[in-house]
Amino acid sequence: MEKVDEFLEYIKVSILDKSIVDTSLILSDRDGFVLGKIIDKSSSADNVIDNSLISTFSSATDQASKLHAGNNKSIVSFFEDRIIVHINVSNVILSIITDTESNVGLILGSQDDLIRSLTSLSNSIQSDIQDM
């Protein structure tokens, strides 16, 4: 768990904090089990994200990938008071929760960097699971 929290802190500071403030991050598996999270103090993200929302994203991205337009990498959800960006890589889902004033284009523009980081973390998690 400590490795995951360090990873989330790295993402928040080095990739997202350049341009996006008031951001919470939740890392989970495809079933919605939360592996780690960093909740911004001014955010109510902890109350919003639950396992069912994350696992629903997993199902929705599988269905979206069936549209014959290639694999779906992310889904953006706009709500009245927040934006949630889910990014899926190798059975690991990163949920980015931010306020409605945030620039989603900047988040999606960081997607390649996030995917590279998620891929290495996912491989590390898979390795840890196999060692158990």
Swiss-Prot record:
Pfam families for the chain: MAPKK1_Int
Identify the SUPFAM superfamilies for this entry: Roadblock/LC7 domain
Q: Which GO terms describe its cellular component?
A: Ragulator complex
Signal peptide (residue range): none
A single Gene Ontology MF term assigned here is: kinase activator activity
Looking up SMART domains in the UniProt record yields: MAPKK1_Int
* Gene Ontology BP terms: cellular response to amino acid stimulus; positive regulation of MAPK cascade; positive regulation of TOR signaling
Q: List the disulfide bonds.
A: none
Q: Which InterPro entries match?
A: LAMTOR3 (IPR015019)
As for family, the record states: Belongs to the LAMTOR3 family.
Per UniProt, subunit arrangement is: Part of the Ragulator complex.
Annotated function: Regulator of the TOR pathway, a signaling cascade that promotes cell growth in response to growth factors, energy levels, and amino acids. May activate the TOR signaling cascade in response to amino acids.
Q: What is this protein called?
A: Ragulator complex protein LAMTOR3 homolog
Species name: Dictyostelium discoideum
Upper taxonomic lineage: Eukaryota, Amoebozoa, Evosea, Eumycetozoa, Dictyostelia
